[in-house]
Amino acid sequence: LQITDRGNDNQKSSMKFDLVIDATGRSSKFHQWLKEKGVNISEQRDDAEIVYYTRHYKLLDGVSEPSRHQEEPSMGDLGYMKYGVFPGDSGHFALIICLPLAETELREAIKTGEGFDSVCRTIPGLLPWIGPDKAKSTTNPFGIGQIHAVWREYLENGQPQVLNFFAVGDSHARTNPLYGRGCSIGTLHAHILSDVLSESNDPIERAISFAELTKERIGPIFEASLREDKNGIRKSAELLEKNQKKEKRSLKKWFGKAFGDALGAAAREKIFVHRGIIKTINLLEKPGEFLQDPKIRRTVLMYMLRGRKKNIGIQRPSGLERTEIIEHISTIN
């Protein structure tokens, strides 16, 4: 490798290593450098079509941190917007808003501090945190885009394209940060690599084994996250274009939506269902494996029998409808 020391007048030096492990994350340049050297690395890249906006706050003196068990949640999905509070130390916290790229009016409004606060204060679950008498902002809103699901393949026809090089975590398989799986995937991937390196000294065997285990153990997590991205894009389009009424009805589509509504409602009210979902989120088991539990399956079925209307009501947090929020932002100076 040729190393450039940016802190020492860009002085260059060449070094050799037994192994190169790329753990540089979503901004990794290694795959580009390898391609420039003629290494064929295939890449799957899917745009989640969303953007995040974050603003940091600090609770005012004398204001206690709100309960995590309040009736109106501090994290939720209104359809046109997802939101969440992430507490820190000493009264500091971050508020993150996730918007579809197509929500141009909302995106424009929320870029300003006034617009960000005004929109968020229409959500009852956020008022205990950012009401005018609760907290003060410590930053302006700032955004992050280019949210892609990325999977890189280092084998071609079953043979490694580069030896003694291993990309781990986001450098190899990147998912939407909305699902909070990045750190868990990175940790799991590091353990996979450790096992591979311990079991063989042969560079070809190592490369093939690492690729196969990555596909076996990380692949299902990546695919589940990608499906959620696609579902989010579809739901956003339906809401924005009012395609719900135009959509052809089918038993399969009805069952899928009814099951999702029932699962979400059951997770809000039944702790053992919630724990099953958390196991999937934290990668303690394969995606959806908790649904093999007969008790959870019976519970979700009982919720389905209650009807979608009641289950949707439990899932959706209080907040303005999309038409109402668009009208609201038109009043912001």
Show the residue positions of the predicted features.
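Predominantly flavin-linked oxidoreductase catalytic cores and closely associated redox partners
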Residues: 1-122
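Intrinsically disordered, low-complexity coil segments
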Residues: 6-12, 75-76, 157, 239-254
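A short, ordered amphipathic alpha-helix with a cationic face
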Residues: 20-21, 184, 249-253
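Short alpha-helix boundary/capping motifs
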Residues: 58-62, 147, 238-239, 291
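A structural signal for short secondary-structure junctions
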Residues: 89, 159-160, 255-258
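FAD/FMN-dependent oxidoreductases across multiple families
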Residues: 103-225
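C-terminal helical "tail/cap" subdomain of flavin- and related membrane-associated enzymes
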Residues: 194-333
